[in-house]
């Protein structure tokens, strides 16, 4: 009888617990033990008033069912942990790279040619060279199959967005530019004959203006007489972006057309500071002698110094470099460059 009493108390406690957990019954999608048959967990409550044997049998069935439910619940917890581990592993796995068109190589990642790397060893990157050494080194670094141009690049302490700090001028290179310059002239009346006599390659008036509007650009310099500027003004959108618009500061608007033609044929070069305050001036070819390159370079330096803008303040020269078309830049010592005096002939 004591055993049955013990079983009865256990049965009541378990029946109460199973009654509270009815809402937590696993769904059929996760567990396979759920069925449509009546739930036996509540059955012992109906047998409380029956005989001893029937009560004991009910207790045994409830106990066995409890063990089954516990085992299934433990298995469900294990499956849930495995699912969580798989989810965490999927999150930690790095995403696979997307397949598509390869990205362009950045400029800093591009490799230089073997030729450039070899000639780059001839000069030290941060060293400032004197003018004579720099020009000699420049000729050594020019080893392409064509005749390269030689250029000077001066960084000035100016801001061209202000009118009093703009720089635009010309320089006559004593030894020429090393290339043939095709000069076109817009003139009328007797100026036409003067231009032809002075060696102009193309001479015209209204007819030449119409050709330019139609896309004719077979010339390097365009010179115009002052009386033609009213008609030339309409060509600004065509000539301006190409740097061919006649301008008094560039010496391409003048009444003395023969002199202008002669100067440009001999090597007169126009230059101007870009928006960052840098001036780019070509001063010859690599097949020039070192002496001729030196003379042209000093003429360019003198012109930049002479045409210093009125609004320039502080130190005017910030840096100076020279280079060939396909070669590395060579940094110059600015103080030595400005104070340099060519040797006098004996």
UniProtKB/Swiss-Prot annotation:
It comes from the Eukaryota. GO terms for cellular component: chloroplast; chloroplast envelope; chloroplast stroma; chloroplast thylakoid membrane; cytosol; large ribosomal subunit; nucleus. Gene3D superfamilies: 3.30.190.20, 3.40.50.790. Keywords: Chloroplast, Phosphoprotein, Plastid, Ribonucleoprotein, Ribosomal protein, RNA-binding, rRNA-binding, Transit peptide. The modification Phosphothreonine is found at residue 177. GO terms for biological process: translation. It is found in: Plastid, Chloroplast. The keyword Ligase does not apply. This is Large ribosomal subunit protein uL1c. The gene is RPL1.
